[in-house]
Amino acid sequence: MNLATIGRKLARLTTNAVVSRPWLWRLFRRVTRWQFDAVAPRWETMRLPDTLAPLEAALQGVEPAPRRVLDLGTGTGAAARAIAERFPEAEVVGADLSPRMLGEARRALPQELASRVRYEEADASALPYEDGTFDLVTHQNMIPFFDEVARVVARGGSVLFAFTGGAGTPIYVPPERLREELKRRGFMDFAEFRAGRGNALLARKAARV
């Protein structure tokens, strides 16, 4: 078994454990930051041409156009840049646990997007944002922390989960599990998308309780 295979198995194990028991994240947080810091300099070279396809397909279903967007697990910022290009009036925050990933994201940010996109270090299990701050929260290949997502999304706002390799993505949560967790937290109007090798799920938070 090579290191890549071991890494994928560990990612899947971590995802399954944390989705079921979010408090376990504290056991994985430090090593996760270390892993992504280590690969940050070469992360962009590892991306495949269709990496953003599921995300971009699902973004077409977001209505109305959001004004404030949070991209969790932004990494080197490719998704945040795509979101800013899709919604030219939106302010986009790309948040990530890895300082080195964020450094790469800042270096890759085009000047024409610099006034609308910023990158911040944040732990998705304890986000430093007020309740209802964002109209859209996106995740790509990211362990979801459902309570925090539900807290920071505004009423009537949307959440988007994209997995670039579908069920083969190391960090993956099946659509039926996403629906179950989101319904419990007041989300509705689910829509599924398939593009490239992956899939995405979009849902809207109820405007009223």
Q: Can you say where each PLM-predicted feature lies in the sequence?
A:
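Class I SAM-dependent methyltransferase SAM/SAH-binding core
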Residues: 70-72, 76-126
